[in-house]
């Protein structure tokens, strides 16, 4: 390797500085990988390349890592900082031997034998000039630009054409101390290290570029030859009394309507546009858990992303983040309503495939779509779909639509060999640009059809949207899920492939709910969501600034000291910082008087802010319920609190997709924190510290509307034990409207008929609609709910339930 200060390298670095823009994966190697700044470090690269090492040098300087040009000096032994598996490839002739690099491995291993305390980190580094995966009918451009082992001339062309799309990826370090102790220090282990590294680099390239792209028409012909589609075409011809040729043409039309037409060139252009867009809209995108997903890709999993659906921005945000995290943007299942010009063709070339809202018993369409999905899985493309089926208008997760999840499980049952893993993804925003439209729709306004004019209208409203949040939840590998749900599933399917297993539908429902629960497990508690939660629980939606900051400090402490799950993320900074962020985004108003500043939510903004509160209300619903128990009782035992929480938790779990694994432990941890923070005192029983009552009342306020709903339901059930589910749903909704009108409840979900349906289904499952005479459970929960309400609200509910027009 030429010396760092040689004229040749200086010239090369100057050229690259002006032609090359490098993206680092992961963005912070020290935070995301196992790198240790206190230990010596060497880099491993696949191929010796002056331009690659020059690009690496630029990045290591910025990251505070050792320069690849600095030799590694250990115990008097001088070795290159970069170890390459292959020598340079000349324009003509054979590649240079890799023996010098194997000898370097040997020297490093030998030093470990001499110096027992030494532990050099070997860090694999992959460089990519562009990320074109290539096509099955590859073009000359791909041949020139996208070879894995380019000559110096081809590398020059790659830098010229693809220098703005250079990616440098660091991987977890390998301990040479471990290798030396476990496997020895001879030439054999050096060769083994080289082989393992080659496999690693090959897998990394597959993760970064994705599988080879098919020719779209060739893909159609391949799908039409499949046995299941041929059979579906024959059945279509017979049932519609048309020729097989006509049925085949219909199938081709369906394929053309459905199939993506992924274009790497468009993705590169979109990356530039989206970088501009995110920088204009957001002050930052916060990401948690990407490394575990990158590892799943590396291990050969077929990845299916299942995000929550807040906004049309979701399609763009997740793909953009995955691209910058060194993974290929997925093929996205988009509603056919988004297939309008010009967005539809652009989405299609960005990887979207389109799905009808309903298949309406169309067997041919179903067969075509299923076969296309199978093909995506078989070829190794990652897939994304929204299991809610549409965007949430209230900020809460919607009940899942199980169609796509069922199709994914069916693909596994039909014999996908690779592990198929669902990745729940929580997407959050400090500002959702459609939120005002959502509340118009909830108030009865008809939903507007998507069009290019809506796009232009949205662009006009672009402004400071704060921050975005992408949290990857705990993955679910479907083969493992099936082993847990139906241990003999492989045998059953092999014995009768055409027979639908009896356990399949219940399993799909369980899986869908598990996905939604794990999305909520990965929630992001941000400045906007936390501040909305506090202010909406206060009288008049307003608080003194110092009290608001103190309450936020309590909530931050609660989330950090008693974490909801390890996948949840919590805003940085203290309460003062969070309030300032919210004010800068103009989400809250501030006024001053001689006694201090007051932060409030404007009356016309209150409904809007419930959307953001609802994103994270599940994180605080149990602490809020505990606070309600404490503030409504002068003294209460831990056992009594746990009993109340146990009674309400099944409904909370169904309504809010909660997944607390050890509820008694969680309740006790929350109580212990309250005691430690001086909010509660404990002798034989628990009681609120008088000076801290206001904080506990604020926390208790977050569960009040939920308890009002439960009080409505259980008062109705206790008063009319034999009422039907449909009656309970309609009368609960009617009573909720009355309660809202009398007590000023504006949260849209309070009047959501679907929510009362969800609760009635859960009540039936829990046995509250049974014919047994003993209704003591219903009466107990009714009394508990009533005891936790304000007297005026309780009186309205009890009086309304016993009123003549309800019964």
UniProtKB/Swiss-Prot annotation:
Record-linked CDD domains: LPLAT_DHAPAT-like (cd07993)
EC number: 2.3.1.15
Keywords: Acyltransferase, Cell inner membrane, Cell membrane, Lipid biosynthesis, Lipid metabolism, Membrane, Phospholipid biosynthesis, Phospholipid metabolism, Transferase
Listed transmembrane segments: none
Reaction it catalyzes: sn-glycerol 3-phosphate + an acyl-CoA = a 1-acyl-sn-glycero-3-phosphate + CoA
SMART domains according to UniProt: PlsC
Motif HXXXXD motif location, chain numbering: 308-313
Any one Gene Ontology cellular component term annotated for this protein: plasma membrane
A molecular function (GO) term: glycerol-3-phosphate O-acyltransferase activity
Superkingdom as given in the UniProt entry: Bacteria
Pfam families xrefs: Acyltransferase, GPAT_C
Membrane topology annotation: Peripheral membrane protein
Cellular localisation: Cell inner membrane
Pathway annotation: Phospholipid metabolism; CDP-diacylglycerol biosynthesis; CDP-diacylglycerol from sn-glycerol 3-phosphate: step 1/3
GO biological process: CDP-diacylglycerol biosynthetic process; fatty acid metabolic process
PANTHER family cross-referenced by the UniProt entry: DIHYDROXYACETONE PHOSPHATE ACYLTRANSFERASE (PTHR12563:SF17), GLYCEROL-3-PHOSPHATE ACYLTRANSFERASE (PTHR12563)
Domain notes: The HXXXXD motif is essential for acyltransferase activity and may constitute the binding site for the phosphate moiety of the glycerol-3-phosphate.
Family assignment from sequence similarity: Belongs to the GPAT/DAPAT family.
Protein name (record): Glycerol-3-phosphate acyltransferase
Protein source organism: Shewanella sp. (strain MR-7)
